[in-house]
Design a protein with these regions (language model features):
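Catalytic cores of phosphodiester-bond hydrolases, prominently lipid phosphodiesterases
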Residues: 1-135
Length: 135
């Protein structure tokens, strides 16, 4: 698992491939890395209406044939009190209430296709996985 720390790359933007620097997925896959672990905001973008959708970075990781583990779901505290801070930065416009946590999990699981989500409070991801029949 290769940890992605966007703060190490000036101007990292999950929607701009030219900004990914050392974390560009295809060169990492070419080196034999099979799993990337970027933070939440690198994997989702605002969609139409109030939806979250996979980011360009998430799509590039999947195109490179890599698995994804992400972090950290509930590090930001209540979403409704500040739109999630750093971890939800890419979707501030659609993450406006505490239910956004489940919207994030659903987008990551169903559309991005992550293999795992690190969370400070595992009850949220466990509840989601049990409801959705995810093993």
């Amino acid at each position: 698992v290769y940890l992605v720390d966007p703060d190490r790359v000036d101007g990292f933007d999950p929607e701009k491939p030219e900004s990914w620097g050392e974390y560009a997925p295809q060169p990492l896959a070419d080196k034999g890395i099979r799993t990337l672990a970027p933070p939440l905001f690198a994997l989702v973008a605002p969609g139409e209406g109030h939806d979250m959708v996979p980011s360009a970075y998430a799509k590039a990781i999947k195109t490179a044939g890599m698995d994804i583990i992400t972090w950290s779901l509930e590090r930001s505290g209540p979403i409704g009190r500040g739109n999630g801070g750093w971890y939800y930065g890419s979707v501030k416009s659609v993450a406006t209430d505490d239910g956004a946590i489940y919207e994030m999990v659903d987008t990551l699981a169903q559309e991005v296709g992550v293999k795992g989500i690190f969370s400070d409070w595992p009850a949220t991801v466990t509840y989601y996985a049990n409801c959705m029949g995810i093993k």
